[in-house]
From Swiss-Prot:
GO terms for molecular function: acetylcholine receptor inhibitor activity; ion channel regulator activity; toxin activity. Keywords: Acetylcholine receptor inhibiting toxin, Amidation, Disulfide bond, Ion channel impairing toxin, Neurotoxin, Postsynaptic neurotoxin, Secreted, Toxin. InterPro entries: Conotoxin_a-typ. The keyword Glycosyltransferase does not apply. GO terms for cellular component: extracellular region; host cell postsynaptic membrane. This is Alpha-conotoxin-like Bn1.2. Expressed by the venom duct. It is found in: Secreted.
């Protein structure tokens, strides 16, 4: 999941990396 590779996005949307 692309968001998971972007720290800021991962922090803002941890559910996308879950």
């Amino acid at each position: 999941k692309e968001c998971c590779t972007h720290p800021a996005c991962h922090v803002s949307h941890p559910e996308l990396c879950g």
